[in-house]
From Swiss-Prot:
GO terms for cellular component: cytoplasm; cytosolic [4Fe-4S] assembly targeting complex; MMXD complex; nucleus. Disulfide bonds: none annotated. GO terms for biological process: DNA repair; protein maturation. The lineage of its organism: Eukaryota, Metazoa, Chordata, Craniata, Vertebrata. Belongs to the MET18/MMS19 family. It comes from Danio rerio. This is MMS19 nucleotide excision repair protein homolog. HEAT repeats lie at residues 879-917, 921-959, 962-1000, 1003-1041.
Length: 1043
C-alpha cells in the first residue's frame, strides 16, 4: 500500500513540478485499475493545491480534472459531494485555475450519483463566481460551461426548474456576447431545452429572446477546410428552433421578421420567411393577428418583385404556414373569423383583380399566392376556390386568344390540383351533413370545369391541349368530380387525340393522361378506347413496296398513328381488366407480323415488345397481372418465336420474330414478368422452360403444332434457327428468385456449355454464356457449383490455349460472363479468372476483345446479372475489383510490348470509367499518367472511353492536375481534330471543363486554346461546332472582369 502511495506521489510530482503531461494518463490508469482512489489523489495533491503559486495550484487542479474526465463514472456519491465542494471553492481562486476547475465540474456533472442539491449548487457557483462572457473566458472554457448546463438539464431537470427565473437570468448572462459557432450550437441547445421543457421564463422572456435573436439571421460562413465541420445550415436550424419554440416570443420575433424581410441580402430574406413558416406551426391566431397586415405586405412584395426562385418559394411557404395556423383557430359566435379576414385581405385587396386584367401581366404571382393560401387547409380552399374559380372560368370563356386561355387554364390547374392539407379530414365532413363526394371544394364547379377541359381538348392549340390533359388528370384524382358520363367523354376525347393528333408534345401528354385515368376508370377504357386502338393498329396496312411508294407521306402518317396506339395501350394497362384486353391486341400484332399478313416492320414489332415490357412492370405490384403473363403472354411469345425459328425458308417469308433485335426486345418482356412471379408460378415457369429447351416439350404452348423432335439448344448452321432462342431461356430461368430451384440444372448447364463453345453465331453463343452466368451466380456454394465451374473452366482453358482453335472467341465470351457472375457474388475463384483475363490482354488475336470485355465486367447488364433479376450482387464490387487489380494492370502495361500496350489502356479506361466519382478522384494521381498515355493511343475506342472518364473528373479541379497540365492540354487539343466525331465532341467537353480550373493554373494556356478552337468552330458537324462554341465562350471570358 505504501508502495502504491509512493507511486502516486511520484506521478503527482512529475506532473506538477516536472511538467510531464503524460503522467496524467498514467494516473488515470492507476485509478481505473484500483491502484489508488480519487480521494487519495486529492490527498497526494495537498501540497500542490495549497501552494502560494497560482501556477502550481493550477497544475494540481489540472491533474485532478484530467483524471476525473476519464474516471468520473466510478465515483461514489460521497466522493462526488467532496469533489464538488472542493471545485466550488476553487472557483473563487486565481483566474488561471478557473479553466481547470470548469473541466473538472464538466466531468462531475456527468456523474449518475450526483447528490441532491448539487446541481443547483454548481450552477449558483458558476453564475456568481465565473464571468462566462467572451472577454473573460476562452472558447474551450465557455464550452465547458454550456456542456455543464446541458448535462445537468438532462439529469437534474427538476432541481434546475426549482431555481425559477434565476436559472434563466444566469444563462442569459453566460451566453451574452458569445461569437464562436461551436459554442453557439451548445448555447442554442440550452435555450431550446429551456423553452421546450417548460422552464419558468419569469420576467426574462425578452432578455432570453434578445440574447439569442441578436444572431438572426445567421450569416456565418465556415472557413475552408473547417476541422469542426459546423455548417451555416446547422446554426440556422438550431437558432430557428429557439426563436419559434414559444408563442411568448411572438411580440418580439414577428416585427424582427418583417424588418429582416426588407433586407437587401437574399439569404436574410429566405431565412426570415422560413422562420415565419416555422412560427405558423407553433403560434395561434392570437399571436399573429396584430402583425398579419405587415407580414402579408412583405410576403406579397417579395413574391411580386423577386427574380429569385428561392425567395419566391420561401414566401409562398410562409404564406401557406400562416393560413394553416389561422385555419386552426376555433370560431366563437362573438368573434370574427381571423382566417376569413386574412383571406379577404389577400383576395380582394391585392390578388383577385390581377386575374381579370386584360394583359394578365401579374396573373402568375397572384395565382401562386392564392394557390399557396388555398392549399394550406380545407377551410382556406373552400374560401379561395369559391372566390377565384368563377372568375377564372368567366375569364376563360370571355377570352379568345389561345395563349391567354392557356395561361388561365394553367392557373386553374393549380387550384384543381389538391394538396394534402386542402383535403377534408377522413370521415369528417366539413360541409354540414353532406356525403363524401360533396366534401370536395370543387363539386359546385364540376360541370363548368369539365366543359372547359373538353373545350380545350377540342382546340387546335397544342399548348392548350397539353394543359387540358393535366387539368383532367387533376380532376380525376379527386373522388366525385368526374361522373360516369364525364369519364366516357374524356376517354372519347383522348382516343380522338391519340388517333388524330400528330404533335409529339400533345401525344405524350395524352398518353400520360390516359394512363392516369385508366388506373381509376378501367372499364371505360376497355369498352371505349381499346377497341378503336385495336382497329387502327390492325387495319389500314399498306402491303406492297409499290403501294408504299405511291402512298408516300400517307404511309408514314399511318405508321405514326400505330406507334401512338401501341404506346397508349401500354400506358393504360395498369389494371388486370385492361391488361387482359390490351395485351392480346399486342400479341395479335406479333402474330400478324409472323405470318406476314399485314406486313408489320421490324421497328413496329420492337415497339410492340417495348409496350409489353412496360405492361409487365405492373406485375411487380399486381399478382393478377403477373399470373396473366405466366398463363397467356409468355407461352404465346415462346410459341410464336419457336414457330418463326422452325419456319422453312422455302415459305418465301422470313418472320421478323427471327430478327435478333426483335428477340432482344422480347427478352425484357419475359424477364420482367418472370422476376415478379410468386414462388409457385415461378417454379412452374422454370419447369416448363427447361422441359421445352431440353426435351422439346411444347405441351404448354398454344397452337401446339410443332415437330416431335425439337432441340433448341443444338448448335445450327442457320443463324435464324432455334438455337438463338436461348436468349428466351435465359429470360425465363435467370430472372426467377434465387429460392426457385431450376430442374435438371446440371444437364441444362452441359447443353448450354456446348452451345456457347461451338455455336458459330455471336447472338447464340453470347446468350448461352449469359444464361450460364445467370445460373452460376445464383447457385448455392458447394460441391455442385464447384464441379460445374471446374468443368466449364477446363473446357475454356483448353480452347483458349489452342491458338489454332476456331472457337477461341466463344470460349473467351463464356469466360468473361462466368467471371462477371463470380465477381458480383465475391466468389473466391473470381480472382483466378480475372488474372486469366489480364494474361489474355497480350494475346495477339484476342487482346482487343479482352480489353472490351472489362466493360462487360464493370457495366450493369440490362438483361441478366442485375438486382431486378434477383442476381447475387454485392455492394461496391467495382471498388473492390479496382483495388485488387489496378496494380496488376499497371504492371502488365509496363511489361507489355509497345504494340500491345493499347489493350491495357483500353481495359484501364473501361475500369476507371465505371468507378464512382469519389474513387476516381482519389486514384487520379496514380492513374493520370496512364490516362494521358491512353489519349495518345491510336485506338479511337480507347480515346473516347478515356475522355468520358476524364471530363467529369476535371470538373472537380483535382490537385493532381497541377503537374500534368501541359501534357493534358497538348493531347486534348490534338483530339479536337480527330477523324471521329464523338472523340472531337468529348475532347471539346474536356477543354471546356479545364476552363473552370483556378485561373492562375490555366491562364497561361488561354491563347493556345483559343487558337486551337478555330478548327472545330468550323467543323462540318453541327454538334461539334456547338461544343466548340461553348468551350470558346468560357475560354474567351477567362481573365475578364466577371468572367
Amino acid at each position: 500500500m505504501a508502495a502504491d502511495n509512493n507511486v502516486l506521489l511520484g506521478l503527482v510530482e512529475e506532473f506538477v513540478s516536472g511538467q510531464v503531461d503524460s503522467k496524467a494518463a498514467d494516473t488515470s490508469t492507476g485509478v481505473k485499475n484500483g491502484q489508488f482512489t480519487v480521494l487519495q489523489l486529492v490527498e497526494a495533491l495537498g501540497v500542490s493545491l495549497t501552494s502560494s503559486q497560482p501556477q502550481t495550484r493550477g497544475r494540481g487542479v489540472q491533474l485532478l480534472s484530467q483524471v476525473l474526465q476519464e474516471c468520473y463514472s466510478g465515483l461514489s456519491e460521497r466522493e462526488v459531494e467532496v469533489l464538488i465542494a472542493f471545485y466550488e471553492n476553487r472557483l473563487k481562486d486565481h483566474y488561471v485555475i478557473t479553466p481547470h476547475v470548469l473541466r473538472g465540474l464538466k466531468a462531475l456533472a456527468k456523474c449518475s450519483v450526483l447528490p441532491p442539491g448539487s446541481a443547483v449548487s454548481i450552477l449558483k457557483s458558476i453564475f456568481q463566481d465565473v464571468h462566462v462572457q467572451q472577454q473573460s473566458l476562452m472558447v474551450t472554457e465557455r464550452s465547458c460551461v454550456y456542456n455543464i448546463l446541458i448535462s445537468l438539464m438532462e439529469s437534474r431537470e427538476e432541481e434546475l426548474k426549482g431555481l425559477g427565473a434565476d436559472f434563466i437570468f444566469g444563462f442569459v448572462q453566460s451566453v451574452d456576447g458569445e461569437r464562436d459557432p461551436r459554442n453557439l450550437l451548445l448555447a442554442f441547445q440550452v435555450a431550446k431545452n429551456i423553452i421546450y421543457r417548460g422552464y419558468d421564463l419569469g420576467k426574462f422572456v425578452e432578455e432570453l429572446f434578445e440574447v439569442t435573436s441578436c444572431y438572426f439571421p445567421i450569416d456565418f460562413s465556415p472557413p475552408p477546410n473547417d476541422p469542426h465541420g459546423i455548417t451555416q445550415e446547422e446554426l440556422i436550424l438550431s437558432l430557428r428552433a429557439v426563436l419559434t419554440g414559444t408563442p411568448r416570443f411572438a411580440e418580439f420575433l414577428l416585427p424582427l421578421i418583417i424588418e429582416k424581410m426588407d433586407s437587401d441580402v437574399q439569404s436574410a430574406k429566405v431565412d426570415s420567411m422560413h422562420t415565419l413558416a416555422a412560427c405558423g406551426q407553433t403560434y395561434s391566431h392570437k399571436e399573429l393577428a396584430e402583425f398579419l397586415p405587415g407580414l402579408w405586405s412583405s410576403i406579397r412584395r417579395e413574391v411580386f418583385q423577386t427574380a429569385s426562385e428561392r425567395v419566391e418559394s420561401a414566401g409562398l411557404s410562409a404564406l401557406s404556414s400562416l393560413v394553416s395556423c389561422l385555419s386552426r383557430s376555433v370560431l366563437n359566435s362573438d368573434s370574427e373569423d381571423s382566417l376569413q379576414v386574412f383571406l379577404n385581405l389577400v383576395l380582394k385587396s391585392d390578388c383577385q383583380h390581377h386575374l381579370c386584367e386584360p394583359d394578365l401581366k401579374l396573373v402568375w404571382p397572384s395565382a401562386k399566392l392564392l394557390q399557396a393560401a388555398a392549399g394550406a387547409s380545407y377551410r382556406a380552399s373552400l374560401i379561395g376556390t369559391q372566390a377565384v374559380i368563377p372568375a377564372l372560368l368567366d375569364q376563360y370563356n370571355n377570352r379568345t386568344q389561345c395563349a391567354q386561355r392557356r395561361t388561365l387554364l394553367e392557373v386553374l390547374q393549380g387550384f384543381v390540383q389538391p394538396t394534402p392539407l386542402s383535403r377534408p379530414a377522413d370521415g369528417v365532413s366539413c360541409i354540414s351533413t353532406h356525403t363524401h363526394e360533396e366534401e370536395s371544394v370543387l363539386v359546385a364547379f364540376q360541370q363548368s370545369l369539365c366543359t372547359v377541359v373538353f373545350s380545350a381538348l377540342s382546340e387546335t392549340s397544342a399548348g392548350l391541349q397539353v394543359t387540358a390533359t393535366r387539368v383532367l388528370t387533376a380532376l380525376s384524382q379527386q373522388p366525385g368530380l368526374l361522373s360516369q358520363t364525364d369519364v366516357e367523354n374524356a376517354v372519347d376525347h383522348l382516343t380522338r387525340l391519340i388517333l388524330e393528333e400528330e404533335e409529339a408534345q400533345v401525344s405524350l401528354a395524352v398518353v400520360e393522361c390516359s394512363g392516369s385515368l385508366a388506373h381509376l376508370h378501367p372499364h371505360a377504357f376497355v369498352s371505349r378506347m381499346i377497341p378503336q386502338l385495336k382497329e387502327k393498329i390492325l387495319s389500314g396496312r399498306v402491303h406492297t413496296v409499290m403501294e408504299k411508294t405511291l402512298s408516300g407521306s400517307l404511309y408514314e402518317c399511318s405508321g405514326a398513328v400505330r406507334r401512338r396506339c401501341v404506346a397508349a395501350l401500354a400506358s393504360v394497362s395498369s389494371q388486370p381488366s385492361v391488361v387482359q384486353e390490351s395485351s392480346p391486341v399486342l400479341l395479335q400484332v406479333l402474330t400478324s407480323a409472323h405470318t406476314g399478313c399485314c406486313g408489320f416492320s421490324v421497328e413496329e414489332v420492337i415497339a410492340v415488345c417495348i409496350s409489353l415490357q412496360r405492361i409487365a412492370v405492373h406485375a411487380r405490384d399486381n399478382e393478377a397481372i403477373g399470373q396473366f403473363f405466366h398463363d397467356i403472354i409468355i407461352p404465346r411469345l415462346l410459341g410464336l418465336t419457336l414457330q418463326a425459328a422452325l419456319q422453312s425458308k422455302d415459305s418465301g417469308h422470313i418472320s421478323p420474330l427471327t430478327d435478333e433485335a426483335v428477340l432482344s426486345a422480347i427478352v425484357p418482356v419475359i424477364s420482367t414478368a418472370c422476376a415478379a412471379l410468386k414462388p409457385e408460378s415461378a417454379s412452374r415457369m422454370a419447369a416448363q422452360a427447361v422441359s421445352l429447351f431440353l426435351d422439346g416439350d411444347t405441351s404448354f404452348l398454344p397452337e401446339n403444332a410443332f415437330p416431335s423432335q425439337i432441340q433448341p439448344l443444338q448448335s445450327q448452321a442457320d443463324s435464324r434457327g432455334p438455337s438463338q432462342l436461348v436468349c428466351l431461356l435465359m429470360a425465363c430461368v435467370c430472372s426467377l428468385p434465387r429460392s426457385v430451384e431450376i430442374p435438371d440444372m446440371d444437364r441444362l448447364l452441359v447443353q448450354l456449355e456446348d452451345l456457347s463453345c461451338t455455336s458459330p453465331h455471336l447472338f447464340s453463343y453470347t446468350f448461352a454464356s449469359k444464361c450460364i452466368a445467370g445460373l452460376v451466380n445464383k447457385r448455392p456454394a458447394g460441391a455442385a457449383l464447384n464441379a460445374v465451374l471446374d468443368r466449364v473452366l477446363k473446357r475454356v482453358s483448353l480452347e483458349l490455349e489452342e491458338t489454332s482453335s476456331t472457337h477461341r472467341t466463344q470460349a473467351f465470351t463464356l469466360l468473361i460472363w462466368v467471371a462477371k457472375a463470380l465477381l458480383l457474388r465475391y466468389h473466391p475463384l473470381s480472382t483466378a479468372l480475372t488474372d486469366k483475363l489480364f494474361s489474355l490482354l497480350s494475346d495477339s488475336a484476342l487482346g482487343s476483345l479482352v480489353a472490351d470485355g472489362f466493360c462487360v465486367l464493370m457495366n450493369d447488364s440490362p438483361d441478366v446479372l442485375n438486382r431486378d433479376c434477383h442476381a447475387d450482387v454485392r455492394i461496391m464490387y467495382r471498388q473492390r475489383f479496382f483495388t485488387e487489380n489496378s496494380s496488376k494492370l499497371v504492371q502488365g502495361f509496363n511489361s507489355a510490348e509497345q504494340a500491345k500496350k493499347s489493350c491495357y489502356l483500353k481495359a484501364l479506361s473501361h475500369i476507371v470509367n465505371n468507378l464512382p466519382r469519389e474513387v476516381q478522384l482519389t486514384e487520379l494521381p496514380a492513374l493520370l499518367p496512364l490516362l494521358l498515355e491512353a489519349l495518345s493511343c491510336v485506338d479511337q475506342g480507347v480515346q473516347l472511353s478515356t475522355l468520358s472518364c476524364l471530363q467529369p473528373v476535371l470538373l472537380e479541379s483535382p490537385a493532381a492536375l497541377n503537374t500534368q497540365l501541359e501534357a493534358l492540354f497538348t493531347r486534348l487539343l490534338a483530339l479536337t481534330t480527330s477523324p471521329a466525331m464523338k472523340v472531337r465532341m468529348a475532347s471539346l467537353r474536356c477543354v471546356h471543363a479545364l476552363s473552370r480550373l483556378p485561373e492562375h493554373m490555366v491562364m497561361p494556356f488561354r491563347a493556345r486554346v483559343l487558337k486551337a478552337l478555330a478548327a472545330p468552330l468550323d467543323d462540318k458537324k453541327r454538334l461539334v461546332r456547338k461544343e466548340a462554341v461553348a468551350a470558346r465562350g468560357e475560354w474567351f471570358l477567362l481573365g475578364s472582369p466577371g468572367g
